[in-house]
Amino acid sequence: MHMPPHLPASPPLSWPQRLEALLKDLTNFPWKSTARTLRERYSEDRLGLTASSLTFTTTMALVPLVTVALAIFTAFPMFAKLQSVLQKWLVTSLIPDNIARQVLGYLTQFAGQASKLGGAGIALLLVTAVALILTIDHTLNGIWRVRTRRSLGQRVLVYWAALTLGPLVLGVSLSITSYAISASKGVVGVMPGGVQFLLDVLQFFMVAWGMAAMYHFVPNTWVKWSHAWAGGMFVSAGLELAKKLLALYLGKVPTYSVLYGAFATVPILLIWIYVAWIIVLLGAVIAAYLPSLTSGIQHRGRSHGLQFQLALETLQQLERVRSDAVKGLTMQQLAQLLRVDALQLEPVLETLSELDWIGLLNEEFKGEAARYVMLANPDATALAPLLDTLLLRREESTQNLWEKGRWPLLNVRDVL
Protein backbone atom coordinates (compact mmCIF):
# COMPACT_ATOMS: atom_id res chain seq x y z
CA MET A 1 0.00 0.00 0.00
CA HIS A 2 1.33 3.38 -0.98
CA MET A 3 1.80 5.56 2.05
CA PRO A 4 1.73 9.34 1.69
CA PRO A 5 5.08 10.96 2.34
CA HIS A 6 5.55 12.45 5.78
CA LEU A 7 5.75 16.20 5.79
CA PRO A 8 8.92 17.45 7.43
CA ALA A 9 8.41 19.01 10.83
CA SER A 10 8.76 22.76 10.87
CA PRO A 11 12.04 23.84 12.47
CA PRO A 12 11.80 25.50 15.90
CA LEU A 13 11.71 29.27 15.85
CA SER A 14 14.81 31.15 16.89
CA TRP A 15 14.62 33.85 19.55
CA PRO A 16 14.68 36.69 16.96
CA GLN A 17 11.83 34.97 15.08
CA ARG A 18 9.85 34.55 18.29
CA LEU A 19 10.40 38.20 19.15
CA GLU A 20 9.29 39.19 15.66
CA ALA A 21 6.13 37.06 16.01
CA LEU A 22 5.40 38.61 19.41
CA LEU A 23 5.81 42.13 18.03
CA LYS A 24 3.49 41.22 15.14
CA ASP A 25 0.85 39.94 17.56
CA LEU A 26 1.15 43.11 19.64
CA THR A 27 0.84 45.24 16.51
CA ASN A 28 -2.29 43.39 15.35
CA PHE A 29 -3.90 43.38 18.80
CA PRO A 30 -7.13 45.44 18.89
CA TRP A 31 -5.85 48.12 21.25
CA LYS A 32 -8.53 50.64 20.26
CA SER A 33 -11.35 48.14 20.81
CA THR A 34 -9.83 47.15 24.14
CA ALA A 35 -9.69 50.76 25.32
CA ARG A 36 -13.29 51.32 24.21
CA THR A 37 -14.43 48.15 26.00
CA LEU A 38 -12.65 49.18 29.20
CA ARG A 39 -14.29 52.60 29.07
CA GLU A 40 -17.76 51.13 28.42
CA ARG A 41 -17.47 48.47 31.12
CA TYR A 42 -16.12 51.00 33.62
CA SER A 43 -19.23 53.11 33.08
CA GLU A 44 -21.87 50.38 32.65
CA ASP A 45 -20.69 48.17 35.53
CA ARG A 46 -19.98 51.19 37.77
CA LEU A 47 -16.50 49.92 38.51
CA GLY A 48 -15.57 53.17 40.23
CA LEU A 49 -18.37 52.68 42.77
CA THR A 50 -17.45 49.01 43.15
CA ALA A 51 -13.81 49.96 43.78
CA SER A 52 -14.97 52.37 46.50
CA SER A 53 -16.90 49.57 48.20
CA LEU A 54 -13.92 47.24 47.92
CA THR A 55 -11.63 49.95 49.31
CA PHE A 56 -13.74 50.25 52.45
CA THR A 57 -14.02 46.46 52.85
CA THR A 58 -10.29 46.00 52.23
CA THR A 59 -9.40 48.63 54.82
CA MET A 60 -11.54 46.83 57.38
CA ALA A 61 -10.18 43.41 56.40
CA LEU A 62 -6.45 44.20 56.21
CA VAL A 63 -5.75 43.40 59.85
CA PRO A 64 -7.90 40.21 59.90
CA LEU A 65 -6.16 38.90 56.78
CA VAL A 66 -2.71 39.62 58.22
CA THR A 67 -3.81 37.99 61.48
CA VAL A 68 -4.87 34.84 59.62
CA ALA A 69 -1.55 34.75 57.76
CA LEU A 70 0.40 35.15 61.01
CA ALA A 71 -1.66 32.39 62.61
CA ILE A 72 -0.78 30.08 59.72
CA PHE A 73 2.94 30.68 60.19
CA THR A 74 2.56 30.22 63.94
CA ALA A 75 0.85 26.87 63.35
CA PHE A 76 3.81 25.73 61.22
CA PRO A 77 7.01 26.55 63.17
CA MET A 78 9.17 25.34 60.27
CA PHE A 79 7.92 28.34 58.26
CA ALA A 80 8.37 30.91 61.02
CA LYS A 81 11.40 32.45 59.29
CA LEU A 82 9.32 33.06 56.16
CA GLN A 83 6.90 35.34 57.98
CA SER A 84 8.97 38.53 57.88
CA VAL A 85 10.09 37.86 54.31
CA LEU A 86 6.51 37.47 53.12
CA GLN A 87 5.26 40.52 55.02
CA LYS A 88 7.95 42.78 53.58
CA TRP A 89 7.48 41.49 50.04
CA LEU A 90 3.69 41.87 50.07
CA VAL A 91 3.88 45.43 51.35
CA THR A 92 6.79 46.62 49.19
CA SER A 93 5.47 44.98 46.00
CA LEU A 94 1.85 46.08 46.37
CA ILE A 95 2.20 49.45 48.13
CA PRO A 96 4.21 52.54 47.06
CA ASP A 97 7.59 52.91 48.74
CA ASN A 98 6.60 56.23 50.33
CA ILE A 99 4.28 54.52 52.82
CA ALA A 100 5.41 50.87 52.70
CA ARG A 101 7.44 50.96 55.92
CA GLN A 102 4.73 52.71 57.94
CA VAL A 103 2.01 50.37 56.66
CA LEU A 104 4.12 47.31 57.48
CA GLY A 105 4.70 48.60 61.00
CA TYR A 106 1.02 49.35 61.58
CA LEU A 107 -0.15 45.99 60.23
CA THR A 108 2.33 44.06 62.35
CA GLN A 109 1.39 46.04 65.46
CA PHE A 110 -2.36 45.68 64.92
CA ALA A 111 -2.11 41.98 64.07
CA GLY A 112 -0.11 41.43 67.26
CA GLN A 113 -2.83 43.14 69.29
CA ALA A 114 -5.46 40.90 67.69
CA SER A 115 -4.13 37.93 69.66
CA LYS A 116 -5.41 39.61 72.84
CA LEU A 117 -9.01 39.61 71.63
CA GLY A 118 -11.58 37.22 72.99
CA GLY A 119 -13.64 34.72 71.05
CA ALA A 120 -16.21 37.32 69.96
CA GLY A 121 -13.49 39.67 68.71
CA ILE A 122 -11.76 36.94 66.73
CA ALA A 123 -15.11 35.92 65.22
CA LEU A 124 -15.73 39.54 64.17
CA LEU A 125 -12.31 39.69 62.49
CA LEU A 126 -13.03 36.49 60.57
CA VAL A 127 -16.43 37.81 59.48
CA THR A 128 -14.74 40.96 58.15
CA ALA A 129 -12.20 38.91 56.18
CA VAL A 130 -14.94 36.67 54.77
CA ALA A 131 -16.95 39.78 53.80
CA LEU A 132 -14.06 40.95 51.62
CA ILE A 133 -13.77 37.51 50.05
CA LEU A 134 -17.48 37.34 49.24
CA THR A 135 -17.44 40.88 47.84
CA ILE A 136 -14.60 39.95 45.48
CA ASP A 137 -16.46 36.79 44.48
CA HIS A 138 -19.67 38.72 43.76
CA THR A 139 -17.83 41.42 41.79
CA LEU A 140 -15.84 39.08 39.54
CA ASN A 141 -18.85 36.86 38.84
CA GLY A 142 -20.75 40.01 37.89
CA ILE A 143 -18.04 41.03 35.40
CA TRP A 144 -18.21 37.55 33.83
CA ARG A 145 -22.05 37.75 33.84
CA VAL A 146 -22.31 34.55 35.87
CA ARG A 147 -25.86 33.92 37.09
CA THR A 148 -25.30 30.66 39.00
CA ARG A 149 -22.97 31.06 41.97
CA ARG A 150 -21.10 28.38 43.85
CA SER A 151 -22.57 27.24 47.12
CA LEU A 152 -21.36 29.02 50.24
CA GLY A 153 -19.53 25.88 51.33
CA GLN A 154 -17.61 25.65 48.05
CA ARG A 155 -16.66 29.32 48.17
CA VAL A 156 -15.45 29.09 51.75
CA LEU A 157 -13.43 25.97 50.89
CA VAL A 158 -11.77 27.59 47.86
CA TYR A 159 -10.90 30.82 49.64
CA TRP A 160 -9.78 29.11 52.82
CA ALA A 161 -7.37 27.04 50.72
CA ALA A 162 -6.12 30.27 49.14
CA LEU A 163 -5.67 31.92 52.54
CA THR A 164 -3.77 28.96 53.98
CA LEU A 165 -1.70 27.68 51.06
CA GLY A 166 -1.06 31.04 49.38
CA PRO A 167 1.12 32.55 52.12
CA LEU A 168 3.11 29.31 52.48
CA VAL A 169 3.83 29.02 48.73
CA LEU A 170 4.80 32.68 48.49
CA GLY A 171 6.90 32.42 51.62
CA VAL A 172 8.89 29.44 50.33
CA SER A 173 9.62 31.06 46.97
CA LEU A 174 10.54 34.37 48.57
CA SER A 175 12.79 32.74 51.15
CA ILE A 176 14.72 31.00 48.38
CA THR A 177 15.10 34.34 46.63
CA SER A 178 16.14 36.03 49.89
CA TYR A 179 18.71 33.32 50.53
CA ALA A 180 20.14 33.75 47.03
CA ILE A 181 20.39 37.50 47.56
CA SER A 182 22.14 37.09 50.90
CA ALA A 183 24.59 34.59 49.43
CA SER A 184 25.36 36.82 46.47
CA LYS A 185 25.91 39.83 48.74
CA GLY A 186 28.34 37.83 50.80
CA VAL A 187 30.40 37.11 47.69
CA VAL A 188 30.23 40.26 45.62
CA GLY A 189 29.35 42.85 48.27
CA VAL A 190 26.91 44.75 46.07
CA MET A 191 24.05 43.21 44.15
CA PRO A 192 24.73 43.44 40.39
CA GLY A 193 22.25 45.35 38.27
CA GLY A 194 21.39 42.19 36.34
CA VAL A 195 20.43 40.36 39.54
CA GLN A 196 18.25 43.26 40.65
CA PHE A 197 16.56 43.25 37.25
CA LEU A 198 15.84 39.52 37.51
CA LEU A 199 14.37 40.01 40.98
CA ASP A 200 12.14 42.82 39.69
CA VAL A 201 10.99 40.56 36.85
CA LEU A 202 10.28 37.77 39.35
CA GLN A 203 8.23 40.15 41.48
CA PHE A 204 6.32 41.32 38.38
CA PHE A 205 5.39 37.78 37.37
CA MET A 206 4.47 36.73 40.91
CA VAL A 207 1.90 39.53 41.09
CA ALA A 208 0.67 38.62 37.59
CA TRP A 209 0.41 34.96 38.61
CA GLY A 210 -1.63 35.82 41.70
CA MET A 211 -4.06 37.91 39.66
CA ALA A 212 -4.28 35.27 36.92
CA ALA A 213 -5.09 32.60 39.50
CA MET A 214 -7.87 34.78 40.92
CA TYR A 215 -9.36 35.41 37.46
CA HIS A 216 -9.15 31.69 36.62
CA PHE A 217 -10.59 30.18 39.80
CA VAL A 218 -12.98 32.76 41.28
CA PRO A 219 -15.61 33.17 38.52
CA ASN A 220 -18.01 30.22 38.42
CA THR A 221 -17.35 29.74 34.72
CA TRP A 222 -14.54 28.41 32.57
CA VAL A 223 -11.76 30.98 32.03
CA LYS A 224 -8.78 30.09 29.86
CA TRP A 225 -5.42 30.44 31.53
CA SER A 226 -4.17 32.53 28.60
CA HIS A 227 -7.01 35.02 29.12
CA ALA A 228 -6.44 35.05 32.89
CA TRP A 229 -2.72 35.66 32.34
CA ALA A 230 -3.48 38.57 30.00
CA GLY A 231 -5.53 40.20 32.75
CA GLY A 232 -2.85 39.40 35.34
CA MET A 233 -0.09 40.95 33.22
CA PHE A 234 -2.21 44.07 32.75
CA VAL A 235 -2.71 44.35 36.51
CA SER A 236 0.96 43.82 37.34
CA ALA A 237 2.06 46.42 34.78
CA GLY A 238 -0.69 48.81 35.89
CA LEU A 239 0.27 48.53 39.56
CA GLU A 240 3.93 49.20 38.80
CA LEU A 241 3.05 52.25 36.72
CA ALA A 242 0.59 53.52 39.34
CA LYS A 243 3.19 53.11 42.11
CA LYS A 244 5.74 55.12 40.14
CA LEU A 245 3.23 57.88 39.35
CA LEU A 246 1.96 58.08 42.93
CA ALA A 247 5.50 58.17 44.30
CA LEU A 248 6.40 60.92 41.82
CA TYR A 249 3.32 62.93 42.79
CA LEU A 250 3.94 62.57 46.52
CA GLY A 251 7.56 63.59 46.04
CA LYS A 252 6.74 66.67 43.98
CA VAL A 253 3.55 67.73 45.75
CA PRO A 254 3.82 66.91 49.49
CA THR A 255 0.27 68.12 50.19
CA TYR A 256 -0.77 65.19 52.37
CA SER A 257 2.39 65.34 54.48
CA VAL A 258 1.90 69.06 55.09
CA LEU A 259 -1.80 68.74 55.96
CA TYR A 260 -1.83 65.50 57.93
CA GLY A 261 1.74 65.18 59.20
CA ALA A 262 2.40 61.72 60.62
CA PHE A 263 -1.23 60.78 59.87
CA ALA A 264 -0.63 61.22 56.10
CA THR A 265 -0.11 57.48 55.64
CA VAL A 266 -3.85 56.78 56.10
CA PRO A 267 -5.32 58.93 53.27
CA ILE A 268 -2.47 57.95 50.96
CA LEU A 269 -3.14 54.26 51.68
CA LEU A 270 -6.87 54.71 50.99
CA ILE A 271 -6.14 56.40 47.66
CA TRP A 272 -3.73 53.64 46.73
CA ILE A 273 -6.16 50.84 47.62
CA TYR A 274 -8.83 52.53 45.47
CA VAL A 275 -6.48 52.90 42.50
CA ALA A 276 -5.29 49.30 42.90
CA TRP A 277 -8.86 47.98 42.87
CA ILE A 278 -9.65 49.99 39.73
CA ILE A 279 -6.68 48.33 38.02
CA VAL A 280 -7.67 44.86 39.26
CA LEU A 281 -11.26 45.27 38.03
CA LEU A 282 -10.09 46.51 34.62
CA GLY A 283 -7.80 43.48 34.43
CA ALA A 284 -10.85 41.30 35.05
CA VAL A 285 -12.66 43.05 32.20
CA ILE A 286 -9.74 42.29 29.87
CA ALA A 287 -9.71 38.62 30.90
CA ALA A 288 -13.49 38.34 30.46
CA TYR A 289 -13.76 40.10 27.10
CA LEU A 290 -10.50 38.98 25.48
CA PRO A 291 -12.18 36.21 23.42
CA SER A 292 -14.49 38.76 21.80
CA LEU A 293 -11.73 41.33 21.35
CA THR A 294 -9.40 38.91 19.56
CA SER A 295 -12.19 37.54 17.35
CA GLY A 296 -13.23 41.02 16.22
CA ILE A 297 -16.68 40.93 17.86
CA GLN A 298 -17.72 44.35 19.09
CA HIS A 299 -19.27 44.88 22.49
CA ARG A 300 -22.62 46.58 21.97
CA GLY A 301 -23.09 49.56 24.22
CA ARG A 302 -25.99 49.44 26.66
CA SER A 303 -29.16 50.89 25.17
CA HIS A 304 -32.88 50.70 25.88
CA GLY A 305 -34.36 47.52 24.48
CA LEU A 306 -30.99 45.93 23.65
CA GLN A 307 -31.83 42.61 25.30
CA PHE A 308 -35.20 42.50 23.54
CA GLN A 309 -33.47 43.17 20.23
CA LEU A 310 -30.93 40.40 20.88
CA ALA A 311 -33.76 38.02 21.79
CA LEU A 312 -35.51 38.71 18.47
CA GLU A 313 -32.26 38.28 16.52
CA THR A 314 -31.59 35.00 18.36
CA LEU A 315 -35.06 33.67 17.51
CA GLN A 316 -34.60 34.68 13.88
CA GLN A 317 -31.31 32.79 13.61
CA LEU A 318 -32.64 29.66 15.35
CA GLU A 319 -35.76 29.65 13.16
CA ARG A 320 -33.56 29.95 10.07
CA VAL A 321 -31.64 26.74 10.89
CA ARG A 322 -34.64 24.86 12.29
CA SER A 323 -34.88 22.50 9.32
CA ASP A 324 -31.13 22.01 8.83
CA ALA A 325 -29.51 18.61 9.25
CA VAL A 326 -27.50 19.86 12.24
CA LYS A 327 -30.06 21.25 14.62
CA GLY A 328 -29.49 24.51 16.43
CA LEU A 329 -26.53 26.81 17.00
CA THR A 330 -23.93 27.03 19.75
CA MET A 331 -23.56 30.17 21.83
CA GLN A 332 -20.34 31.06 20.02
CA GLN A 333 -22.03 30.61 16.62
CA LEU A 334 -24.89 32.86 17.71
CA ALA A 335 -22.44 35.45 19.01
CA GLN A 336 -20.59 35.43 15.68
CA LEU A 337 -23.80 35.72 13.65
CA LEU A 338 -25.22 38.50 15.80
CA ARG A 339 -21.85 40.28 16.10
CA VAL A 340 -22.27 40.52 19.85
CA ASP A 341 -20.21 39.54 22.85
CA ALA A 342 -21.12 36.14 24.31
CA LEU A 343 -21.28 37.68 27.81
CA GLN A 344 -24.03 40.02 26.60
CA LEU A 345 -25.88 37.20 24.85
CA GLU A 346 -25.88 34.75 27.78
CA PRO A 347 -28.61 36.44 29.91
CA VAL A 348 -30.83 36.70 26.81
CA LEU A 349 -30.48 32.97 26.17
CA GLU A 350 -31.32 32.29 29.81
CA THR A 351 -34.50 34.38 29.52
CA LEU A 352 -35.60 32.55 26.36
CA SER A 353 -34.86 29.22 28.06
CA GLU A 354 -36.95 30.20 31.10
CA LEU A 355 -39.85 30.97 28.74
CA ASP A 356 -39.36 27.48 27.20
CA TRP A 357 -38.98 29.06 23.77
CA ILE A 358 -35.52 27.58 23.22
CA GLY A 359 -33.69 24.60 24.69
CA LEU A 360 -30.10 23.44 25.07
CA LEU A 361 -29.31 20.29 23.09
CA ASN A 362 -26.47 18.25 24.60
CA GLU A 363 -25.30 15.44 22.34
CA GLU A 364 -22.49 13.10 23.26
CA PHE A 365 -20.23 13.88 20.32
CA LYS A 366 -16.58 14.42 21.03
CA GLY A 367 -15.49 18.00 20.64
CA GLU A 368 -19.00 19.30 19.87
CA ALA A 369 -20.45 22.04 22.04
CA ALA A 370 -24.06 22.12 23.19
CA ARG A 371 -26.45 23.85 20.79
CA TYR A 372 -29.53 25.98 21.33
CA VAL A 373 -32.61 24.88 19.38
CA MET A 374 -36.01 26.47 18.79
CA LEU A 375 -38.79 24.84 20.84
CA ALA A 376 -41.64 27.32 20.48
CA ASN A 377 -44.05 27.25 17.56
CA PRO A 378 -43.78 30.82 16.18
CA ASP A 379 -47.32 30.72 14.77
CA ALA A 380 -48.93 29.69 18.07
CA THR A 381 -46.73 31.48 20.63
CA ALA A 382 -47.75 34.94 21.84
CA LEU A 383 -45.02 37.57 21.92
CA ALA A 384 -46.43 39.17 25.09
CA PRO A 385 -44.28 37.24 27.62
CA LEU A 386 -41.07 38.40 25.92
CA LEU A 387 -42.33 41.98 25.66
CA ASP A 388 -43.29 41.93 29.32
CA THR A 389 -39.93 40.48 30.42
CA LEU A 390 -37.40 42.39 28.31
CA LEU A 391 -39.09 45.49 26.87
CA LEU A 392 -41.99 46.97 28.86
CA ARG A 393 -43.85 45.45 31.79
CA ARG A 394 -47.61 45.32 31.45
CA GLU A 395 -48.91 47.50 34.27
CA GLU A 396 -51.70 49.99 34.78
CA SER A 397 -49.57 52.89 33.54
CA THR A 398 -48.62 51.05 30.33
CA GLN A 399 -51.96 49.34 29.66
CA ASN A 400 -53.06 51.87 27.01
CA LEU A 401 -49.83 51.41 25.07
CA TRP A 402 -50.24 47.64 25.18
CA GLU A 403 -53.86 47.74 24.04
CA LYS A 404 -53.63 50.46 21.37
CA GLY A 405 -50.42 48.98 20.02
CA ARG A 406 -52.19 45.61 19.84
CA TRP A 407 -49.18 43.98 21.50
CA PRO A 408 -51.26 41.21 23.12
CA LEU A 409 -52.34 40.07 19.63
CA LEU A 410 -48.81 39.66 18.29
CA ASN A 411 -47.22 36.26 18.00
CA VAL A 412 -43.58 35.32 17.50
CA ARG A 413 -44.03 34.80 13.76
CA ASP A 414 -44.96 38.48 13.35
CA VAL A 415 -41.46 39.58 14.32
CA LEU A 416 -39.37 36.90 12.62
UniProtKB/Swiss-Prot annotation:
It is found in: Cell inner membrane. It comes from the Bacteria. InterPro entries: UPF0761_bac, Virul_fac_BrkB. The chain crosses the membrane at residues 60-80, 117-137, 156-176, 187-207, 222-242, 268-288. Its main location: membrane. It is a multi-pass membrane protein. GO terms for cellular component: plasma membrane. Keywords: Cell inner membrane, Cell membrane, Membrane, Transmembrane, Transmembrane helix. Belongs to the UPF0761 family. NCBIfam families: yihY_not_rbn (TIGR00765). This is UPF0761 membrane protein Rfer_2991. It comes from Albidiferax ferrireducens (strain ATCC BAA-621 / DSM 15236 / T118).
